[in-house]
Design a protein with these regions (language model features):
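Membrane-interface helix termini and inter-helical loops of multi-pass transporters
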Residues: 1, 31-43, 219-220
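Membrane-interfacial loop-to-helix junctions in multi-pass inner-membrane proteins
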Residues: 1-14
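Mid-bilayer segments of alpha-helical transmembrane spans in multi-pass integral membrane proteins
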Residues: 13, 17-29
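Alpha-helical transmembrane segments
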Residues: 27-29, 46-220
Length: 220
Protein backbone atom coordinates (compact mmCIF):
# COMPACT_ATOMS: atom_id res chain seq x y z
CA UNK A 1 0.00 0.00 0.00
CA UNK A 2 1.70 3.20 -1.19
CA UNK A 3 -0.25 5.27 1.34
CA UNK A 4 1.59 3.48 4.13
CA UNK A 5 5.03 3.59 2.51
CA UNK A 6 7.87 5.18 4.41
CA UNK A 7 8.40 5.95 8.09
CA UNK A 8 5.79 7.71 10.20
CA UNK A 9 6.45 11.19 11.58
CA UNK A 10 7.15 9.84 15.08
CA UNK A 11 9.62 7.26 13.80
CA UNK A 12 11.46 9.94 11.83
CA UNK A 13 11.47 12.21 14.89
CA UNK A 14 12.83 9.35 17.01
CA UNK A 15 15.69 8.86 14.54
CA UNK A 16 16.54 12.58 14.63
CA UNK A 17 16.41 12.63 18.45
CA UNK A 18 18.66 9.57 18.65
CA UNK A 19 21.18 11.09 16.24
CA UNK A 20 21.06 14.34 18.21
CA UNK A 21 21.74 12.57 21.51
CA UNK A 22 24.64 10.64 20.00
CA UNK A 23 26.10 13.80 18.48
CA UNK A 24 25.64 15.84 21.65
CA UNK A 25 27.21 13.08 23.74
CA UNK A 26 30.19 12.90 21.39
CA UNK A 27 30.82 16.65 21.42
CA UNK A 28 30.50 16.94 25.20
CA UNK A 29 32.14 13.77 26.48
CA UNK A 30 34.57 12.88 23.68
CA UNK A 31 35.56 16.29 22.31
CA UNK A 32 35.25 18.09 25.65
CA UNK A 33 33.13 20.91 24.25
CA UNK A 34 31.22 22.67 27.03
CA UNK A 35 30.85 26.25 25.79
CA UNK A 36 29.46 28.15 22.82
CA UNK A 37 30.31 31.52 21.32
CA UNK A 38 27.90 34.43 21.16
CA UNK A 39 28.66 37.20 18.64
CA UNK A 40 30.69 39.98 20.29
CA UNK A 41 30.36 38.26 23.69
CA UNK A 42 32.80 36.02 25.55
CA UNK A 43 32.44 32.25 25.54
CA UNK A 44 29.30 31.06 27.29
CA UNK A 45 29.95 28.05 29.51
CA UNK A 46 26.90 25.79 29.33
CA UNK A 47 28.38 22.48 30.47
CA UNK A 48 26.13 19.46 29.96
CA UNK A 49 23.43 21.72 28.45
CA UNK A 50 25.43 21.42 25.25
CA UNK A 51 23.85 17.98 24.72
CA UNK A 52 20.20 19.17 24.70
CA UNK A 53 21.29 22.21 22.66
CA UNK A 54 22.73 19.88 20.04
CA UNK A 55 19.48 17.90 19.96
CA UNK A 56 17.43 21.11 19.71
CA UNK A 57 19.47 22.41 16.77
CA UNK A 58 19.22 19.09 14.96
CA UNK A 59 15.44 18.85 15.41
CA UNK A 60 14.97 22.50 14.40
CA UNK A 61 17.00 22.03 11.23
CA UNK A 62 15.23 18.79 10.34
CA UNK A 63 11.85 20.51 10.74
CA UNK A 64 12.96 23.00 8.10
CA UNK A 65 12.83 20.19 5.55
CA UNK A 66 9.44 21.55 4.49
CA UNK A 67 11.45 23.99 2.36
CA UNK A 68 11.74 21.14 -0.16
CA UNK A 69 8.55 22.21 -1.91
CA UNK A 70 9.63 23.93 -5.12
CA UNK A 71 12.06 22.80 -7.81
CA UNK A 72 15.53 24.13 -7.00
CA UNK A 73 14.59 25.71 -3.67
CA UNK A 74 16.04 23.38 -1.06
CA UNK A 75 19.10 22.51 -3.14
CA UNK A 76 19.96 26.14 -3.81
CA UNK A 77 19.55 27.18 -0.17
CA UNK A 78 21.56 24.23 1.13
CA UNK A 79 24.35 24.90 -1.37
CA UNK A 80 24.53 28.53 -0.23
CA UNK A 81 24.65 27.53 3.45
CA UNK A 82 27.43 25.00 2.97
CA UNK A 83 29.34 27.46 0.77
CA UNK A 84 29.19 29.94 3.66
CA UNK A 85 30.53 27.27 6.01
CA UNK A 86 33.31 26.51 3.56
CA UNK A 87 34.45 30.11 4.01
CA UNK A 88 33.98 30.05 7.79
CA UNK A 89 35.98 26.85 8.23
CA UNK A 90 38.71 28.09 5.89
CA UNK A 91 39.21 31.37 7.74
CA UNK A 92 39.21 29.46 11.04
CA UNK A 93 42.09 27.41 9.61
CA UNK A 94 40.00 24.23 9.72
CA UNK A 95 41.15 23.29 6.25
CA UNK A 96 39.90 19.69 6.34
CA UNK A 97 36.44 20.87 7.37
CA UNK A 98 36.49 23.60 4.71
CA UNK A 99 37.36 20.99 2.08
CA UNK A 100 34.55 18.76 3.33
CA UNK A 101 32.00 21.60 3.16
CA UNK A 102 33.23 22.46 -0.33
CA UNK A 103 32.69 18.85 -1.42
CA UNK A 104 29.17 18.88 0.08
CA UNK A 105 28.48 22.14 -1.75
CA UNK A 106 29.68 20.61 -5.00
CA UNK A 107 27.53 17.55 -4.47
CA UNK A 108 24.45 19.70 -3.88
CA UNK A 109 25.20 21.73 -7.01
CA UNK A 110 25.41 18.50 -9.01
CA UNK A 111 22.00 17.54 -7.58
CA UNK A 112 20.69 21.03 -8.33
CA UNK A 113 21.63 20.63 -12.00
CA UNK A 114 18.89 18.01 -12.26
CA UNK A 115 16.54 19.59 -9.71
CA UNK A 116 15.96 22.95 -11.39
CA UNK A 117 12.63 23.20 -13.25
CA UNK A 118 11.50 20.85 -14.53
CA UNK A 119 13.05 18.68 -11.82
CA UNK A 120 14.08 15.16 -12.79
CA UNK A 121 14.42 14.00 -9.20
CA UNK A 122 13.94 15.41 -5.71
CA UNK A 123 15.78 15.70 -2.41
CA UNK A 124 12.93 14.57 -0.14
CA UNK A 125 13.45 13.80 3.55
CA UNK A 126 16.24 11.33 2.85
CA UNK A 127 18.43 14.14 1.55
CA UNK A 128 17.17 16.67 4.09
CA UNK A 129 18.01 14.40 7.04
CA UNK A 130 21.56 13.84 5.80
CA UNK A 131 22.19 17.51 5.07
CA UNK A 132 20.64 18.89 8.27
CA UNK A 133 22.51 16.34 10.40
CA UNK A 134 25.75 17.32 8.68
CA UNK A 135 24.92 21.01 9.07
CA UNK A 136 24.37 20.58 12.81
CA UNK A 137 27.79 18.95 13.21
CA UNK A 138 29.48 21.64 11.09
CA UNK A 139 27.82 24.44 13.09
CA UNK A 140 29.20 23.01 16.35
CA UNK A 141 32.65 22.31 14.89
CA UNK A 142 32.89 25.95 13.77
CA UNK A 143 31.33 27.20 17.04
CA UNK A 144 28.69 29.12 15.13
CA UNK A 145 25.49 27.79 16.67
CA UNK A 146 24.20 31.26 17.49
CA UNK A 147 24.93 32.70 14.06
CA UNK A 148 23.43 29.64 12.36
CA UNK A 149 19.91 31.19 12.46
CA UNK A 150 21.27 34.04 10.33
CA UNK A 151 23.25 31.83 7.96
CA UNK A 152 20.26 29.53 7.54
CA UNK A 153 17.54 32.20 7.80
CA UNK A 154 15.51 30.86 4.84
CA UNK A 155 15.26 27.53 6.67
CA UNK A 156 14.24 29.30 9.88
CA UNK A 157 11.49 31.40 8.35
CA UNK A 158 10.14 28.35 6.54
CA UNK A 159 9.78 26.42 9.80
CA UNK A 160 8.39 29.43 11.66
CA UNK A 161 5.76 30.04 8.98
CA UNK A 162 4.40 26.52 9.52
CA UNK A 163 4.43 26.90 13.32
CA UNK A 164 2.73 30.31 13.14
CA UNK A 165 0.10 28.96 10.77
CA UNK A 166 -0.71 25.97 12.98
CA UNK A 167 -0.86 28.04 16.19
CA UNK A 168 -3.00 30.72 14.57
CA UNK A 169 -5.50 28.15 13.27
CA UNK A 170 -5.67 26.48 16.68
CA UNK A 171 -5.86 29.65 18.84
CA UNK A 172 -7.53 32.21 16.58
CA UNK A 173 -9.39 29.88 14.27
CA UNK A 174 -7.97 31.48 11.13
CA UNK A 175 -4.85 31.41 9.02
CA UNK A 176 -2.06 34.00 8.86
CA UNK A 177 -0.82 32.86 5.45
CA UNK A 178 -2.89 31.72 2.50
CA UNK A 179 -0.80 28.55 2.46
CA UNK A 180 2.11 27.36 4.59
CA UNK A 181 5.10 27.02 4.29
CA UNK A 182 5.82 30.60 3.30
CA UNK A 183 7.06 29.86 -0.22
CA UNK A 184 3.66 28.40 -1.09
CA UNK A 185 2.02 31.57 0.28
CA UNK A 186 4.00 33.59 -2.25
CA UNK A 187 2.81 31.24 -4.98
CA UNK A 188 -0.78 31.69 -3.77
CA UNK A 189 -0.55 35.49 -4.12
CA UNK A 190 0.59 35.16 -7.71
CA UNK A 191 4.38 34.85 -7.73
CA UNK A 192 5.60 32.28 -10.27
CA UNK A 193 7.63 29.46 -8.73
CA UNK A 194 10.89 30.54 -10.38
CA UNK A 195 10.57 34.02 -8.86
CA UNK A 196 10.03 32.58 -5.37
CA UNK A 197 13.05 30.29 -5.73
CA UNK A 198 15.41 32.94 -7.08
CA UNK A 199 14.40 35.49 -4.45
CA UNK A 200 14.99 32.90 -1.74
CA UNK A 201 18.43 32.32 -3.25
CA UNK A 202 19.19 36.06 -3.13
CA UNK A 203 18.07 36.27 0.50
CA UNK A 204 20.08 33.13 1.26
CA UNK A 205 23.26 34.62 -0.22
CA UNK A 206 22.84 37.85 1.77
CA UNK A 207 22.16 35.95 5.00
CA UNK A 208 25.06 33.59 4.37
CA UNK A 209 27.49 36.48 3.92
CA UNK A 210 26.21 38.36 6.98
CA UNK A 211 26.31 35.22 9.13
CA UNK A 212 29.80 34.33 7.92
CA UNK A 213 31.09 37.83 8.72
CA UNK A 214 29.49 37.82 12.19
CA UNK A 215 30.92 34.39 12.95
CA UNK A 216 34.43 35.39 11.94
CA UNK A 217 34.36 38.84 13.56
CA UNK A 218 33.20 37.37 16.88
CA UNK A 219 36.44 35.38 17.02
CA UNK A 220 38.63 38.50 17.03
Amino acid sequence: NSAKAGLSFYKRLAIVLALGLIGGYWFYFKLGMDSVSLPFIEEWQIGFWLVPLFVLVMVALFSSGVIDGLDGLSGGIMAIIFAAYTGIAYFQSQIDLAAFCAVVTGGILAFLWFNIPPARFYMSETGILGLTTTLTVVAFLTDSVFTLPIIALPLLITSLSVIIQLLSKKIRGRKVFLVAPLHHHFEAIGWPAYKVVMRYWVIGIICGLIGMILTLISKF
